[in-house]
């Protein structure tokens, strides 16, 4: 256990859920990561660090573009990093490396990367000012930084509605404050600009990102509901600890909620995200 419940969750139930359903989550989140990568303009030879790389899909995708340079994925979840390494070995990718690394607590080597990227991996820092300063010092002069993060909870039914339905039956963690570590800690675009500017980044651009998420086939509504619960660090521990009847009730409630959001045979729910880019001057 650590003093950061988010880190504990990603090394616990949420991390295990992401490993179990990695292909599903990669498909669901690909448009969000792609929105960032499309703005960064990766080139062969770029040295890239993928922050909060999880099970490694984005790092492997980056590696395929920047070869012969190495793409480095860092994460605090040992569980997910083990899966990432297994994936890399299975693909035969040789220009990728995965490191257990807390970007906030452990500065990376100075000027060791041309570009830093993150798909929903920078919202969980207890001290984001330190984390962003460490990312800044890891980049060369002229280096680029891009990430995607969520806007306000109320604008993200994709995340909130299944959890709110399930919360009537299983325990959830206390709701974090608006700037405390959580998926929504960077919802305020002015805060993003302030944090990055203070860290030494220039030309900070905050733009709306993808506005919906595909949570899976309508033929597997119950599976989609279970995944939505198990991957969420705010409710996954309580769901795992609950009795079987309570877990079943939670999944049933989330399933009913998600059944109202079927489009062309898919479960499609609204999202609100920011795509953020910045440079090192």
What are these regions (language model features)?
Residues 1-46, 57-61, 80-83:
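Conserved class I S-adenosyl-L-methionine
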Residues 199-202, 225, 274-281:
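Core SAM-dependent methyltransferase catalytic element
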């Amino acid at each position: 256990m650590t003093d950061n419940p988010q880190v504990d969750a990603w090394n616990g139930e949420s991390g295990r859920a992401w490993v179990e359903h990695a292909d599903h989550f990669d498909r669901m989140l690909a448009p969000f990561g792609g929105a960032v990568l499309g703005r960064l303009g990766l080139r062969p030879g770029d040295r890239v660090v993928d922050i909060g790389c999880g099970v490694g899909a984005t790092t492997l995708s980056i590696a395929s573009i920047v070869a012969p340079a190495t793409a480095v994925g860092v994460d605090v979840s040992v569980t997910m990093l083990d899966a990432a390494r297994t994936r890399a070995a299975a693909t035969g990718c040789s220009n990728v490396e995965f490191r257990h690394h807390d970007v906030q607590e452990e500065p990376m080597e100075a000027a060791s990367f041309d570009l830093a990227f993150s798909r929903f991996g920078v919202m969980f820092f207890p001290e984001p000012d330190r984390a962003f300063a460490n990312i800044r010092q890891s980049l060369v002069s002229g280096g680029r930084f891009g990430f995607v993060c969520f806007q306000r909870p109320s604008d993200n039914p994709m995340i909130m509605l299944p959890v709110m339905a399930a919360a009537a039956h299983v325990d959830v963690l206390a709701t974090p404050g608006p700037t405390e570590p959580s998926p929504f800690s960077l919802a305020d675009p002015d805060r993003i600009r302030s944090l990055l500017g203070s860290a030494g980044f220039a030309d900070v651009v905050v733009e709306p990102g993808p506005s919906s998420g595909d949570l899976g086939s309508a033929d597997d509504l119950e599976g989609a509901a279970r995944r939505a619960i198990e991957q969420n660090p705010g409710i996954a521990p309580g769901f795992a600890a609950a009795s079987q009847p309570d877990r079943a009730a939670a999944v049933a409630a989330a399933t009913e909620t998600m059944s109202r959001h079927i489009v062309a045979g898919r479960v499609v729910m609204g999202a609100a995200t920011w795509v953020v880019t910045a440079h090192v001057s």
